[in-house]
Design a protein with these regions (language model features):
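A contiguous loop/helix-start segment that scaffolds small-molecule binding in enzyme catalytic cores
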Residues: 2, 156, 160-270
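Short glycine-rich anion-binding loops that position phosphate/pyrophosphate groups of nucleotides
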Residues: 12-15, 83-87, 163-165, 217-219
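Loop/turn-to-beta-strand initiation segments
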Residues: 4-5, 75-79, 155-156
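Glycine-rich, flexible N-terminal cofactor/catalytic loop recognition
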Residues: 1-56
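Class I SAM-dependent methyltransferase SAM-binding "motif I" and its flanking Rossmann-like core
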Residues: 96-150
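Short active-site oxyanion
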Residues: 26-32, 104-108, 155-157
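Conserved helicase motor
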Residues: 56-62, 136-139
């Protein structure tokens, strides 16, 4: 009979956040697959847990899975942990979980801390709907493409970000309510709230990985409203704003995703 694979969430800063169930599982399993065995050893030593550790990080996860699956098939129980937080959420865990499921091995989540969720619930932004993006691509071109893709998203955005990249990210996203969360659950926990200029200014001297939370875009909602209007009604909206005919036609074309010549021809024939 196969063993079980446990995905065990661990504290993201404050060791008091570990759950009683997590401690029990870590004590009962045969092996612990850890993102960084040195970090996990500190956690285990604190709680006086002694178990064999197996290195399982993002650079060796796919190569390591065969050995882990073999142990599971032998009836051994394995706990997967990341350095902090929930395995599989921007951390190793997804690959081995998927493989275990393919092999009909039970995968059991042991809930606990997750930096993204902890930051969201204390952000003051909409928590009903949100999009978690984790780490953005390192490649500048791919990174820009991803930001352009999500800048009109109406749901709250959650991104793991480095301070020196915040300005470039926010320049593309545009001005709206923004929250920067850092050192979550630690002594120097901090939530920085403001608009784009305020956040960029306050983040210049900060260090370490942060959680960037961005209010959903209102522009997409406005575009949907405008697109439900007739062309004449759409024209009147911008005319009341004092725009020239040329400017109005350009904006209508952009709102509706059509060639501006089509809009120009419509009003020319009226």
């Amino acid at each position: 009979m196969s063993g079980k694979l446990y995905l065990v969430a661990t504290p993201i800063g404050n060791l008091e956040d570990i759950t009683l169930r997590a401690l029990r599982i870590l004590k009962e399993v045969d092996y612990i697959a850890a993102e960084d065995t040195r970090n996990t050893l500190k956690l285990l030593n604190h709680f006086e847990i002694k178990k064999p550790l197996i290195s399982n990080h993002r650079h060796n996860e796919e190569n390591r899975e065969n050995g882990l699956i073999e142990k599971l098939k032998e009836g051994k129980n394995i706990a997967v942990v990341s350095d902090a937080g929930t395995p599989g959420i921007s951390d190793p865990g997804e690959v081995i979980a998927r493989r275990a499921i393919e092999e009909n091995i039970d995968v059991i989540p042991i809930p606990g801390a997750c930096a993204a969720i902890n930051a969201l619930i204390a952000s003051g932004l909409d928590t009903k709907e949100f999009v978690f993006l984790g780490f953005l691509p390192l490649n500048k071109k791919l990174r820009k493409e991803k930001l352009e893709e999500i800048k009109n998203e109406t749901k709250t955005l959650i991104i793991y970000e480095a301070p020196h990249k915040i300005k470039d990210s926010l320049d593309i996203i545009g001005n709206r309510k923004i929250v920067l969360a850092r050192e979550i659950t630690k002594i120097h926990e901090e939530f920085i709230r403001g608009n784009i200029d305020e956040i960029i200014e306050k983040s210049e001297n900060l260090k370490g990985e942060m959680i960037l939370l961005i209010e959903g875009s209102h522009e997409a909602n406005n575009e949907n409203i405008l697109n439900n209007l007739s062309l004449d009604e759409h024209y009147n909206v911008y005319e009341k704003q004092g725009l020239s005919k040329k400017e109005i036609i350009k904006k209508i074309a952009k709102d509706r995703g059509v060639n501006k010549n089509e809009i120009y021809q419509y009003f020319l024939e009226k």
